[in-house]
Swiss-Prot record:
Residues that hold Mn(2+) 1 according to the record: D248, E260
Chain residues that bind Mn(2+) 2: E260, N262
HAMAP family (alphabetical): RimK
Protein name (Swiss-Prot/TrEMBL): Probable alpha-L-glutamate ligase
Binding-site residues, Mg(2+) 2: E260, N262
Keywords in alphabetical order: ATP-binding, Ligase, Magnesium, Manganese, Metal-binding, Nucleotide-binding, Protein biosynthesis
Binding-site residues, Mg(2+) 1: D248, E260
Domain ATP-grasp positions: 104-287
Organism taxonomic ancestry: Bacteria, Pseudomonadati, Pseudomonadota, Gammaproteobacteria, Pseudomonadales
Enzyme nomenclature, EC number: 6.3.2.-
PROSITE patterns the UniProt entry points to: ATP_GRASP
Stored Pfam families: RimK, Rimk_N
InterPro entries per UniProt: ATP-grasp, ATP-grasp_RimK-type, ATP_grasp_subdomain_1, RimK, Rimk_N, Rp_bS6_RimK/Lys_biosynth_LsyX
Example of a GO MF term: ribosomal S6-glutamic acid ligase activity
Length: 301
């Protein structure tokens, strides 16, 4: 197969591994810098050009679209879909999962366990917003943040009010979430491919920190997940419409709670921790499923 990898940086671990895994299995791999591709939106023959040439003959495309380039990245991916190229994750699913509020609303509608969450722009009653999610301690998040940025733990009501006011002063929409004390600063990253969790790891925040992101100095270790956690992760990915996803779960006193569904999960942490060939499993998934025009939207974007 001829497989495109949409990635801004061919030297990133995840991009390198996907290219290696594809080549080892006999596929032709090409990394395309998402922002440098440009498109012809003509109705009779949609095209993508890159480095002065039309991209042709691709069977599948693997989007590794960073949060900052979501809008243009999804447009390029949608153009591939219009050309009948099979996407590992569809553009509509990626944009859905990048909008944290929309993602939580969809998960909530399907009855998937979530922390109690409030959402606000400039509420006229901040104490009521805080009480609505069960009071302090609570977690306050800016909607656009990634890798643990824009996330604050407010341990007292006073602190929560100050943080919320500060964010509103910056004209930010925010999410206010109950703090799951019993998780002890740890979460579980479940790596879903198709309808299976193929690998999972526990991420533990470093001492004095509550964000377990590996970018924040958290540490990763092996963990055995329960059938309920496995089912929750697979269902969450399915609700978002993602074939490949990193689903972050907290262990709470009332079962697994989904924190986030990531449409472009990093491979380094999960492969290093588990020793599994996750990149190879992603390529195998494409081998089984890639057919021209086989998006849920039938290539209509």
């Amino acid at each position: 197969m001829k497989i495109a990898v949409l990635s801004r940086n061919p030297r990133l671990y995840s991009t390198r591994r996907l290219v290696e895994a594809g080549q080892q299995r006999g596929h032709e791999m090409q990394v395309i810098d998402t922002l440098r591709a440009y498109m012809n939106i003509a109705s009779h023959k949609p095209q993508i050009h890159y480095r002065g040439r039309a991209l042709e003959g691709f069977d599948a495309v693997i989007p590794r679209i960073g949060a900052s380039v979501t809008f243009y990245g999804c447009a390029v991916l949608r153009q591939f879909e219009m050309m009948g190229v099979y996407p590992l994750n569809e553009s509509v699913a990626i944009s859905r999962s990048r909008d944290k509020l929309r993602a939580l609303q969809l998960l909530s509608r399907k009855g998937i366990g979530l922390p109690v969450t409030g959402f606000a722009h400039s509420p006229d009653d901040i104490p009521d917003l805080i009480q609505m999610v069960g009071g302090a301690p609570l977690v306050i998040k800016v909607l656009e943040g990634t890798q643990g940025m824009g996330v604050v733990l407010a341990e007292t009501t006073k602190a929560a009010e100050s943080v919320i006011e500060a964010f509103f002063g910056l004209k930010q929409d925010i999410m206010v979430q109950e703090y799951i004390q019993e998780a002890g600063g740890a979460d579980i990253r479940c790596f879903v491919v198709g309808d299976k969790v193929i690998a999972s790891m526990k991420r533990q925040a470093k001492a004095g920190e509550f964000r377990s992101n590996l970018h924040r100095g958290g540490s990763a270790s092996l963990i055995k997940i329960t059938p309920e956690e496995r089912m929750t992760a697979v269902r969450a990915a399915k609700v978002m419409g993602l074939n490949v996803a990193g689903v972050d779960i907290l262990r709470s006193n009332h079962g697994p709670l989904v924190m986030e569904v990531n449409s472009s999960p990093g491979l380094e942490g999960i492969e290093t921790t588990t020793g599994k060939d996750v990149a190879g499993m992603i390529i195998q998934y494409l081998e089984k499923n890639a057919e021209p025009g086989q998006t849920r939207t039938k290539g209509r974007g």
